[in-house]
Amino acid sequence: MISYAPLWKTMERRGATTYTLQVKGNISSSTIRRLKAGDSVSTNTLEALCRILDCTLEDIVAYLPDDDKPEAPPY
């Protein structure tokens, strides 16, 4: 699963708010809701967040293995 927890920490360190994302990066309120809910967003959005916050992808997202998810068959 993808976590956006690093995004919120990066925003706090940079003194950015969701309003900053909307104004500086033209990130829509619906996209911000998706981020808060942990839903998927486009790579264009991830790129815009990196640009706005002057950071890398690792500062925005983290991959968390889903231990409860069954392994996919090899075919």
Cite the ranges covered by each PLM segment.
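Short, basic-rich loop-to-helix N-cap that marks the start of a DNA-contacting helix
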Residues: G38-R51
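Short, charged recognition helix plus adjacent turn
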Residues: T10, V61-Y75
